[in-house]
């Protein structure tokens, strides 16, 4: 294999590998996954970011030292941040508040200014991320709103790079391509190129349940928008760049199916990809299994799963969202979000130092820990206990937890009635749930609300 020398990180964008999947049930079909997660910014949106910035420079819309503003669910922002850092542009990104923390940390590490806005409002609301970004661009002197949703350089990136790469990799023999739609650039660009070079190639839409796009494909109409957790695809409006009239079939994919499929992809094929990949792969597998003759089908690993480790690949988060079902016991243990017998509860021992406890609190983003001795709860320590006992003296961080913890602990047997749990929570306390004397876990008000919500969802 010839190893190439590159002179800029932007030279690494594109020419991503194509992997045939062998360990998933693809029916009579051959299913290929284009590994866009191998781009330097970690997603297919690197292609779009490079194309849009280059075209803006060519048209004189961006001058050295200029400011770029964009609305993004994350990956376009990462691509823009990567290129903006190389070209010394200031970048301001408006992002929905459902974006993973890893993406936000990555964006800020690249030097971007990240402004969070609501993800529970629709287009036309002043807090909607696209409306917010457009307004911000109007108010910022010399700023260029790159506007991926209406920027022709977006689909151009796929018509000039992604499409011919696929065609070459599969020697011109592609029966179907499964895509998702966020801005619509991938679908629009691929369709434009394949219509000319491979008219037989069908386009399949993978759409998160709650998005309106699958309805538009199936019926030409759409109703009210729902909500979904998958990031980067699905919309509450029809993106101008999306050529939905050319879509052959649309599949609606729930968050549960998408997340489990992405996790399965990692477990059986070794590919760490993000939540939108789970949506695309779920639809691709359904399409493949529905065929009566062999076909060559392509879909995408849209981005890297390393941005979803705290969410989709975190069992505790998945349970809290109701995406991993835990068998109900019919007692108070059903309200425990982080169970001790599953290794999910962060605990302390009486002889641990306050410094060690504080480190655990910061590491796991929690404010209190149960203190265990021989499997029994002997106290609870929280941030206020640390404040009262340290009192600005760093030396006191070496004190043992036993000197700072609260020994007044409300312990409920798991067989107690829910009314007793509610009585404890009504007093602003945390309930300790036990099986006889064996500690099972803590229950907070938030845990109760989460359990109730998940019961409704199921």
Q: Model-predicted segments: where are they?
A:
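PLP-dependent amino-acid enzyme catalytic core
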Residues: 1-335
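Glycine-rich acetyl-CoA-binding "A-motif" of GNAT/NAT acetyltransferases
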Residues: 377-380, 418, 439-442
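Short glycine/proline-centered loop/turn elements that form peptide/ligand docking sites
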Residues: 98-101, 344-345, 354
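Bateman (tandem CBS) regulatory domains
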Residues: 246, 330-345, 352, 397-409
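The conserved cystathionine-beta-synthase
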Residues: 346-365, 372-373, 390, 410-429, ...
